[in-house]
Amino acid sequence: MTVATSELGIKPQVELYPEIEPYDTRMLDLGDGQQIYVEQCGNPEGKPVIFLHGGPGGGGGTERRRFFDPQAYRIVVIDQRGCGLSTPHIASAQTSADMATNTTWNLVDDCERVRTALGIDTWQVFGGSWGSCLALAYAETHPEAVSELVLRGIF
């Protein structure tokens, strides 16, 4: 039996939330020559959510802030090691980024460092594409820190 969402009173969200600017941006030093870019948007008192981008090699862009209601969520966005605004960037000719440190388990540890640095007890973990794999690995190793797990475009 197929039931249209309109029959259930469900209106699908087809538009993203309006563009917003971060209220906090920082570089988090990981102690191994890597720094990751971290930003917070939305409601500082809202439900914490971390957005894990695809790639590897993704990052950047303002669209990732727009998946969440900025009135309800404290939106944490990072650029994973070597991506976006994080340094050193893997695609930069001026640097010799050490790819040996760019492992799944280091990325999982990076997420946990961000959570701790921001003073967050638990958060929703939202991953897309490669970020869905990273989200699963994080949730498996830090279940006490994950309130919900959302995976999209599963890689």
Identify the residue ranges that each predicted region occupies.
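Short, basic/low-complexity N-terminal boundary segments at the transition from targeting/disordered tails
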Residues: 2-16
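N-terminal cap/lid segment of alpha/beta-hydrolase-fold proteins
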Residues: 12-40
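Conserved HGGG/HGGXW glycine-rich cap/lid loop of the alpha/beta-hydrolase fold
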Residues: 30-90
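Residue-level signal for well-ordered alpha-helical scaffold segments within enzymatic catalytic domains
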Residues: 39, 113-117, 137
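Short glycine/proline- and charge-enriched loop/turn segments
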Residues: 91-97
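Alpha-helix capping and helix-loop boundary segments enriched in small/acidic/polar residues
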Residues: 98-102
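Conserved acidic catalytic loop of the alpha/beta-hydrolase fold
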Residues: 105-123
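Conserved hydrolase catalytic core segment
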Residues: 121-155
